[in-house]
Curated annotation (Swiss-Prot):
This is DNA mismatch repair protein MutS. ATP binds at residues 614-621. Pfam families: MutS_I, MutS_II, MutS_III, MutS_IV, MutS_V. The lineage of its organism: Bacteria, Pseudomonadati, Pseudomonadota, Gammaproteobacteria, Enterobacterales. One of its GO terms (cellular component) is cytosol. Coiled coil: none annotated. It comes from Yersinia pestis.
Amino acid sequence: MKNNDKLDSHTPMMQQYLRLKAQHPEILLFYRMGDFYELFYSDAKRASQLLDISLTKRGASAGEPIPMAGVPYHSIENYLAKLVQLGESAAICEQIGDPATSKGPVERKVVRIVTPGTISDEALLQERQDNLLAAIWQDAKGFGYATLDISSGRFRVAEPADLETMAAELQRTNPAELLYPENFEPMSLIEHRHGLRRRPLWEFELDTAKQQLNLQFGTRDLIGFGVEQAHLALRAAGCLLQYVKDTQRTSLPHIRGLTMERQQDGIIMDAATRRNLELTQNLSGGSENTLAAILDCSVTPMGSRMLKRWLHMPIRDIRVLTDRQQAIGGLQDIAAELQTPLRQVGDLERILARLALRTARPRDLARMRHAFQQLPEIHRLLQPIDVPHVQNLLSQVGQFDELQDLLERAIVETPPVLVRDGGVIASGYNAELDEWRALADGATDYLDRLEIREREKLGLDTLKVGFNGVHGYYIQVSRGQSHLVPIHYVRRQTLKNAERYIIPELKEYEDKVLTSKGKALAIEKGLYEEIFDLLLPHLPELQLSANALAELDVLANLAERAETLNYSCPTLSDKPGIKIMGGRHPVVEQVLKEPFISNPLTLSPQRRMLIITGPNMGGKSTYMRQTALIVLLAHLGSYVPADQATIGPIDRIFTRVGAADDLASGRSTFMVEMTETANILHNATEQSLVLMDEIGRGTSTYDGLSLAWACAENLASRIKAMTLFATHYFELTTLPEKMEGVVNVHLDALEHGETIAFMHSVQEGAASKSYGLAVAALAGVPRDVIKRARQKLKELESLSNNAAASTIDGSQMTLLNEEIPPAVEALEALDPDSLSPRQALEWIYRLKNMV
């Protein structure tokens, strides 16, 4: 439709639609018409493609056919779920007027706006994943970033210092919807994301943001939240809060504070590290064979979501980590017993968010009641546990006897889905409601009596009394007996084989019954809102309890996992280093059919780098990753897959493991590898754990070897990070002879004829050979190709042994440390623009003599 179309050229109904659509130009408008939600014009075309629904036409308005698409009202939630998964938003427009009394189109208004980041309805949410709305701000000083989980009220801000840190935050939080200012410059950072929303600059204004936040929290300033000077973050938070208010159209009492996330509080992991360690998503984008898949047996959705947050934000505070370790140890004997009532608590966190938004459904209140009923048993089980952190959490879990009593008296045992269906409020809760219900419920008895009386009085054996949703109450008589009905029977409807009538007595009763049903439903809706009013003052204590219950679920889950998977409690030390005895990869050991070979690891100030050699498939990458995962689990407060582990201070974990072309950004495999390597060399510290796997393999042999050598040298001598450096460049195994703190280890294999057996056991010293051809044969490379490769290998090894350029003397690697020839030095010092022709000729002869 053209923007300059005049409203008065359209039908009254389309005028109403266009006025509503003008208020929501950028999102799909679902316009209620009878039993359908209809979409028109460009919305209809978009919805047809997005939802795979038929595109039709509805008459004409302003002289043109109107494109139209629609979905049944009872299926709307399914279609909305599909839209939000695609990053789309929708406005839901309902009929609020009475068609019987309306002159012209029935009055309609938009009653809710559904966006990917602001949904709270359980039908639209993934129950075991956070669903975040985020806002981003950027200027010369850096980035501001805010996230809100509206389904829990969790509001966080951060100020990433640079592009790489911001990219890592986006990857960690993975928002469903992202608000950004219209002048945002680094679009490459976000342009590939779903759910992008461009916002005007004024929505990020700092003073307005502070005013909005203080108003929301009921404070005079933001000093108490520690964010008063976080101006970049506050700009993002202000825009985010305004957007939520605009879309939700209600107060947000469950959003009661703001938390500043600071990098120094946790172990920093960049986007590549999170991806390579496969914490919650595998390299194929799925959730199978990830750390979360093994570790998460939480019995509540809110516990599962909390555990995933812990996985992505390992912390450094030894006091908090020790509290968690002690709690896990204290819960091991009762974990299974505790999980029984916890399972019945369900997703209390999201139920409370819907209560705060006044969108909680009857079954939410029934689930809340059921959760309250579990609290005494949880208290009984935990009171004997003499662990401070467990008792602290238990003190936050209230026992809401009065609220439980309210819900037991007010809500029926198994309520319907919606309040408008009626039958939500229990009998005996309200006398007036009971009276109106009695009148409505007595209809069946009355109709039975009327049917018997009229049938006997008139002698019509086909006569029966019934009710139809369109025509109301009726007396039906077969066509063959219809000529016998008395004159006061007024025909209401004609069927193929029968006639339907109404009589004054039945009409009077119909009015009374319909009035009583309407009255009962109106009273019920009012009482339902009153229950909200009685529950909402307790929201802060309820949220505190839900959070404590979620953490108890996580800790009980980790206790069960430690017992089941034979994990041990790591020692957290303030002395630098990592010492692991019998370490195992938590995921690989669960998917392997044969027993997993455990391995030790020692890193210390005197042993800062391990050069790891050995065959492909020998277990180098597994050994490296398991070290990172053990360190990460220790910084959750979890037990770890090892016989024993002592973990010193860690500030960052870096992984340069594997790579693939980044086609979307036009970057080759080697470019991706070098970008990740550069990030490590710029940001790693002495307290960082660095995994470097096969650096330099994406280019020529000499280039690759040179880069690998220089990177290893830099990490070992300048940065002094704790490094696991896997390589196939055997020249690097001479590094320990030249540098302190560098040690060779290897994973071995045994060849027998043309077969190979991988030992998967880490040994001190360098590997003796690479076994590349044996692995190729194992992979199914044709025998004649393997045979030819063996011949060629012998030729190359013979050439290599005779070539001076490939030798490495005892003090230096000539390939990398050759002196610059005098002729080259002379050329570098020469300024050709200052030479006369004669001088240039003299220089040519001089250089020739140097060569």
